Each structure stands twice: as C-alpha cells, then as structure tokens.
Amino acid sequence: MPTDNENSMTNVEQAEKYWQQFLTAPALTDDDKAIAKQHHDVLLTAFARSSFLAETIIQKPSFVSRTVEQTVEQTVEQTTEQDSDEQLQKNVDKEASSPWVAMYRSALDITLETVKTEDDLLKALREYRNQEMARVTFLDVLNKQDISTSLERVSALADVLLTGAYHWIYQHLAIRYGTPQNNGEDMHMYILGMGKLGGKELNFSSDIDLIFSYPEKGETQGGRKSIEHQQFFTKLAQKLIQALNKITNDGQVYRVDMRLRPFGDSGPLVMHFAALEDYYQDQGRHWERFAMVKARVINDDNSEDVKWLNSILHPFTFRRYLDFTTLDALRNMKKLIATEIRRRRLNNNIKLGAGGIREVEFFAQSFQLIHGGREPALQSKSLLRTLDALTELDIVEKDVTEQLKHDYLFLRKVEHTLQQCQDRQTQTLPDSAWQQAALIEVMGFDSYSTFLNQLDATMARIHGHFNELVEESQDSHSDEDQLFIACQDAWRLSLQEEEFAETFSEHLSSKDITGVYPILVAFKDKQRNYRIGQKGEDTLNKLLPEILYVLINQHPNHISQVLKRLLGVIEAITGRTTYLDLLLENPDVLKQLVKLCERSDWIAQEIKRFPLLLDELLTPLYLGQQNTDIHTSKKEYQLELRETMLRIEQDDVEMLMDGLRQFKLCQQLRIAASDISESLPVNNVSDKLTVLAEVILEHVVNAAWMQMRQRYGVPSHLEGNDKGFAVIGYGKLGGYELGYGSDLDLVFLHNAPRGISTDGNKSLEAQQFYIKLAQRIMHLLNTKTLFGQLYETDLRLRPSGNAGLLCCHIDGFEKYQTEEAWTWEHQALVRARAICGDVGLLKDFTRVRHTILSQVRDSKSLATDVCKMRLKMREHLLSKNNDKVDLKQCVGGITDIEFMAQYLVLANAQSADSMTTYPDNLRIFDTAVKARIIDPSTASKLQKAYLKLREQYHHLTLADTKYADQSEELDAIREQVRQHWDTLFGTCSE
C-alpha cells in the first residue's frame, strides 16, 4: 500500500516503481520475466491503475502468465458464450448456467486434493483467491470486461471458495466425529449468502454476510466420537469462518460477518431449521425482511433440504397480500441512512450517500417486499432482473428502470475501481491525486472534475427516484400568520428594541421582550462571523424565524432562558448544515427540541455537545407510554444495538467505539426525555439506564474477546462459545440504580485452570490473557472519542483494590472475601450481581456471594463498623455548602438508606437465607419484611423516601446542577430517615 510520500507521486510514477520492484522480486523466474517484458506496456498501464494487482504480482511473479496470457485467452472464449447483459441477468439466479462457477470449482478442487492440514487449506484458499482476483482486476482496469461480468465472476469465486472450504472441513471433521444423519443420508449445514453475495453482485473487496442452518437435531454416526449435530455444525462453522477470515502472510479470503443471523452476536452460530422458523415467525423485523430478499443457499448439497429451508424463509420475506407497511419501514431506513451520513460525514460515499448504491437497492427491494408475495418475478435475488420485472409488470415505467440500471452499473464500476486500487473495502472517493488519476483513466474521463459532474448527475437522478417512492408532505405557514411574519421581521430586519417590542406586543409580555431581544441580537452578531457558505446562511435565515415561532407558540416559562439554550444548540451545529436542514425540514423535530430545552438544561447541553442526538427527535418514541418490564427493555435494547452495529465493520475498532457511544447517547436521551415527559415512571428510569449499561457491556465484552482471540487465540481448555470469563457489577449497576452519567463499578473474574495457555500463534498464559482482556474492555469503555466516553469505570472494589489483579480467578476471589475482606467490602458485595459471562462462572459467583453474606457476624461490631464507615464517607464527601443539600451524603440522605439496607443483609442473612437474594435496596426492604426483620411501615417509609430522593437526584442531573434547594418537604424526608437510622443503630451512630 502506498505511503504518504508515495501518495504525492503520479500513478504513472507509481507504476514504474512497481515495475522495478517486480524485476528484482526474489521469486521471479526467467520465464516469468520474459512474459512480463513481452506485455510490458499493458502491465505498466494496469499497475498504474491498481496497486493491489502490482503488489500481488510482485509477491507471486508466477501469477504473470496466469494473469496476462491465460486471461486474454479466457476473455475471447467467454465473449462468445456471453453475448449480452440480458443473458447475464438470466444467469444470475441459476448457478449452473454460470460458466465461472464450473471453471473455478474445477481448478480449486484439483488444488484441494493435495491439502492435508488446516494450515495448508488456509494457504491454498488465499493463493487461489489472490490469483483469480488479480485476473479480474487486470481485465477490469483495462476495460476488457463489463461490470456485470466482473460482478458475476467475483461472486462465483466467492461461492466456490466457500463451498470448497466447507466440504474440506466437513470431511475432516467427519473422520473424527462421524457424519450428521437424516434418514440414513448425510446431513449438511446450509450456508445462506446474504446481501450482494446472495444476489451474485459481490463487491470486489467485500466482506460476506452469512447465516448457517441445518435440518434437524440428532447425533453424528460412524466416527471415533459421536457428538450432537449442534456441536458438529458449530465446530464446522467456527473452522469455516477461521479458514476465510483469518489474516495470514497470504492475506485473507473474506471478512466474514455473522451479525445478520438470528439474535446477532448473542445468538448461536448455527440453528436448526425449526429454531430458524420460530425466530422469523415470532421475532423477525422489517430490516431482516429487506436482508432476506437476497438470501441464497450457496451449497446446494441436498435439493430437498434446500426446498425445506426456502419454505421457511419465503413466507417471512414475501407476504401473500400487498404489504404497504414496507414503505413505512423504508422511510425509517432512509432516516437511518441520513443519520449515518450525518454522523459519519459520508458526503463522498457512493454507497451510502444520497443517490448512492444503497438507494437503488432499497428502491428495488421495497417493491419486492410489497408485491413479491403475489408476483414470483419479483422474488429474484438479482437487482437488475428485479428492475426489469418491475417494468414487465407495469409497476414502474421503463425509462425509470432503464435509467436506474444504467446509473447503478456506473456506480458499481466506480466502486469496483476504487476497491481494486488497493483491495480495500471502500466506497469513498479518493483524496490523493494518483488514485484520482487511476479512477478517471478506468472510468474513461478526461479530468476528475468532469467525472465528478457525471457522478453528481447520476446520484441526483437516483436520489430523485428514491425520494418519489418515500416522499412525505411538509407543514407550511399561512400568509396571514401574523406571529410568523413578526418572527421573520425580528430575524431579517435590524429592529431597534422599541421596534422589536412593538412587533411582538401582542405575542410576548414586556418582561419576555426585554429578555429575548438582547439574546437574539447577540446571536445575530455572532452569526455574521460564521463561515457557513451561502447555502448554510440561507438555511439559517429560514430556520431562525421558525425557532422563534415555535418557541412563542409553546408559551414556556422563562422564555429567554429557553431561547438561550436553543441558540446554544444552533451555534453548535451551524457549521454542519445537514443538521440545520434537519430542523428546517422537520417541524415536529423543532417542536420537540424546544420542549426538551425548556424542561432540561442537561438535555440541551447533551444535544449541544453531540448534535447526532437531534436524529432521535425524528421519531420521538419517548412520548408514548413506556414499557416498564426490565426484561423486555433489555431485549429491546439488544435488538436495537444489534441493528445499529450491523452498519459497522467488525474489525473497525474506531467505528465500533463511536457506534457504541452514539447508541448510548441516543438511548440515554430517550430515557431522559421520557422522564421529563412523565411517560416513564420515576422508579423505572434507573431500571432502563441499568439494563442499557448491561447490554452495552455485553457487546463490549464480545468485541474485546473477538479482538483478543484474533491476536492470541483462546485459552485451550474452553469449548464452543465459552469464554471462562464473567463481569460482576457493583454499586449502582449491581443495584439497578444507575443515574444519568453514573460510572460503573466492575469486577472481572475467570476460572482458567493453572498451566493453561492460549491456542493462537502468539500464545499467552491464561491469567495474562484475561488481564489483557480486562484491559481491552476498559479501553473500549473509557477511551474518549468525539462522542465522549462510553462509561467511566471503577475497578477498586476488586480483591486488594488497586493493588490487585485486574481479573481475578474465582477461587482467589472467594479466598479473599473469606479471609481478608473488610466489612465495607462485604457491604459492597450486598450490591453486587452477575452481569454477563459464562453461566457456570456466574453461578459460582452467586454461590460465593451468598456464602460470604451469610457468615455469622456480631451485630454490635457490625453496627459499629457500618457507622464508622458512614461517618468517614460523610467527612470526605459531604458538600460544605450550607445553603444547598447534598442528597447523597447528607444526614438522612440516599447513602444512609443504602447503608441501612446493607446492614440488614449482613446482620440477618445467616438466619434468613432470602436476604441475599436481591442486590437492590427496594427489594431488600421487601425481603426484610417477609423475614420479619423490620415492620412493613418502616420498610414502606424508607422505600418512599428513597424513591423521592432518587427522583430529585435524577432531576438535579437533568437541570445540570449537583445540589438541591432547601425545602420543608426535603427536611421532613431527611428527618424521617434519620429517625430510622437512630432506631437501627442506636448510640453507635452518634
């Protein structure tokens, strides 16, 4: 790949540099050199247009003859067999009619016959992939084949590499475990190719989206060791993914993405047909229907099984009735795309940008989902064939579909050329001059500006057709709306204060006029210094009157204060006109922004810091009555996070961190907005914030594990998907009591036996592996990006605190808690619970926790320890501001109630087992009542006081302040809590 210095070279200079490197390549033979010199000019041209091709041939000079001579011969043969794009489109749904599959399979089968080990398999697959992709690149950059042929060849090669690897691994696993059986016949796992692979329209440098499934449960037969079908196919899937995905000295075959499978990363790698059917019937979502349109079985090992599988997927994808709900789903997906473009600033992206490849795909797929149940012609996997069918069925005019086909193929050619330059999955136009030169040479343009003009026109046409499909009407103002006229005058004219007062005399009080005028004038003065271009200035001039209009119409209290918050948001987004457009084009979004800024300075500041949150106002889900079941909330977050992360490359750590932070910010805004809109009960705010953190933690752990596994392998004692690792939540996370901005108290545990190491090329002792895993998790959580920190974390509650290991063995944890822990550490353990990890290890933790909390304790000594710790905390943490109240640390505050709950557990668990069941204060008090430790009246008063104090604490955060004002109501609550404290602890509390 070219360096920064090389980026300043022309593409011709790049080509000459590559030619000299080729001539001095260690593996170059005289025959290869002679062939290369014979084709010097054509090779130099190809090198100038693709550094991937040049570097591949330098590394493997023997590819020269196969790339240059055999490719030219092959092109002549194929031209006679494939006369037109129409024939290619007919072939696309029938693998057997594609000559490329037969050609590739024949050659790869010969290669794989000599492969004996998995390492040899990986090498053979990569060498064959590189050889054939070099041939495709050579033809493409010299324009010796059209883009339709190139797409089909790349897809056929993927099919063959996938099935070749699959069958080799299947046969070798069968030697050890036997074969899965179904009525006496060998049973296979079926590989569903999704997306462009399914449609035989694969990118040159693409990942592949797969789903694995097999017919039925059972056990293998005929091997040295029989195992369940699920185990067999899971092992097969894992080895297949590794064979394709692993990066070796020879590169990678494909990046494999399994996130489209049922339940995403949290789901099993392989599912039997019945489980697959249950999932899509009960839980399949709209976006999964879009994805399933292109699903294709890659390995047709048993036609009856494939029919069975298709009979499951077909009714989910294609409804028997006209399904116009698809358009609503498409509108939502359009908004997601627009959101992604804004957040990732993808303005030069030919796939995701407005009028990009994705919009053509959605255009075709939406009609497939609406009409496909009744029109078999619309069930094709091929986008081009689908567009033809839309015209044949009189659904879309021919001039529209022909234009879309032409424009789509133009964009695919651009995409292919971009990716063939360096074999990188990119759809973004290049910045470097040599890459721009290479691009326009292949595309046939005289200059880059001419190419950009053609590209802009192409994408504008596509975007126009897409918008016609999903357009929605917009609100407008009446010409007689006097308030709106006043708002326009206030912004557009340089009104003096007296004129401003007269203009708004019928709409605002004199006090509000006095407050609003200087704020508006100051903002207008600032705005003159903004360098936002004519379009940005025009948008701002249209938007400001709308803001004033909505603000005055809503009659908020403290109107000048709300305007100041609103203009703070506008100032933050002035340089990003897409967000100004968002507010201008969506009146409901603007109305919601005004409401939220009125009710919460914290929300206003969050939106100011992270303008991406404006996208959440497009669909204000927080306005409806919220689900309050904690398990349902968690499931909803899991599904939404899965959908969010599908848009991010698995190996892009920076985008992973940004995606998680964006997800958290958006969900946290929804919770806060629900809170202040009173659509979410106060005691459920913490529930939602807590399960949100759990879901994000699970994803972070899985991502960190994947990164560690790629580098070091996994500890050798593990089987299947086990990690031998667990995350324990303490404090507010453990007690289901997270607030806005709470940090996470975490402890990491593992259960690896002594002497175990990882099985990767770079092996580590298991303890070191788990410490590095913990460090990786902390990095993903703590790193500050443009979107802030995911969570601030605190590991000081682990055994031995900061002096202890970052990840402790479960046996060491138990020994420490039994022999060394202080009373305050056992208090902390009351609020600890298992968050995520291996089931067996989580059960071990729960057992240890119960054992420790149930120890026999002297109640008087315990009370003394608890009181001393409380006084010590108050001395260090209580605010010295006597005019305000620190709700957490004050006498009769939140922490006093928490300490009382912890004392009740530690003092009584030895005689009342149930006291260790729950980690949260409210249920601890309920349990204490059932165990007759405290009376119902006391429990009820403490619970009500706790909820009231927490409610106030949440609202202080939303008001962006730390301490509460003194009030009679607050004094009464604190006095009541203090009395219960004195009753429980007596003289030791003094």
Curated annotation (Swiss-Prot):
Keyword Nucleotide-binding attributed: yes
Tagged with keyword Nucleotide-binding: yes
Annotated stretches, region: Adenylyl transferase: 484-990
Coiled-coil portions: none
Residue span of region Adenylyl removase: 1-474
Pfam families: GlnD_UR_UTase, GlnE
SUPFAM superfamilies (UniProt xref): Nucleotidyltransferase, Nucleotidyltransferase substrate binding subunit/domain
InterPro entries noted in UniProt: GlnE (IPR023057), GlnE_rpt_dom (IPR005190), NT_sf (IPR043519), PII_UdlTrfase/GS_AdlTrfase (IPR013546)
Gene Ontology MF terms: [glutamate-ammonia-ligase] adenylyltransferase activity; [glutamine synthetase]-adenylyl-L-tyrosine phosphorylase activity; ATP binding; magnesium ion binding
GO biological processes: regulation of glutamine family amino acid metabolic process
Annotated keywords: ATP-binding, Magnesium, Multifunctional enzyme, Nucleotide-binding, Nucleotidyltransferase, Transferase
Gene Ontology CC terms: cytosol
EC identifiers of the protein: 2.7.7.89, 2.7.7.42
Essential cofactor(s): Mg(2+)
Reaction(s) the record says it catalyses: [glutamine synthetase]-O(4)-(5'-adenylyl)-L-tyrosine + phosphate = [glutamine synthetase]-L-tyrosine + ADP; [glutamine synthetase]-L-tyrosine + ATP = [glutamine synthetase]-O(4)-(5'-adenylyl)-L-tyrosine + diphosphate
Protein purpose: Involved in the regulation of glutamine synthetase GlnA, a key enzyme in the process to assimilate ammonia. When cellular nitrogen levels are high, the C-terminal adenylyl transferase (AT) inactivates GlnA by covalent transfer of an adenylyl group from ATP to specific tyrosine residue of GlnA, thus reducing its activity. Conversely, when nitrogen levels are low, the N-terminal adenylyl removase (AR) activates GlnA by removing the adenylyl group by phosphorolysis, increasing its activity.
Family: Belongs to the GlnE family.
NCBIfam families attached to this UniProt entry: PRK11072.1
Protein's UniProt name: Bifunctional glutamine synthetase adenylyltransferase/adenylyl-removing enzyme
Organism, scientific name: Alteromonas mediterranea (strain DSM 17117 / CIP 110805 / LMG 28347 / Deep ecotype)
Taxonomic lineage of the native organism: Bacteria, Pseudomonadati, Pseudomonadota, Gammaproteobacteria, Alteromonadales
Gene: glnE
